[in-house]
Regions:
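Short, structured beta-strand/loop micro-motifs enriched in basic residues and often containing a Trp
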Residues: 1-8
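SH3/SH3-like (including bacterial SH3b) beta-barrel domains
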Residues: 8-17
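Boundary regions of SH3-family modules and the immediately adjacent low-complexity/disordered segments
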Residues: 39-54
Length: 54
């Protein structure tokens, strides 16, 4: 499933920018989701900053 990032999400490893398209990598039940960006980096982000993309 593809998602679009709604707001910038800074982490210790870098920043996931608003408008970037990411793919679901692994889903966790605690309200977070693990996604992979177009560079292959894996991010652990809250679901509320993502919007489903068709």
């Amino acid at each position: 499933m593809k998602y679009m990032v709604l707001v910038d999400h800074p982490t210790a490893e870098g920043i996931l920018y608003k408008g970037e398209i990411v793919r679901e990598y692994e889903n966790k039940p605690n309200g977070h989701i693990r996604v992979k960006d177009n560079m292959g980096r894996i991010w652990f982000v809250p679901k509320n900053i993502l919007a489903k993309k068709s």
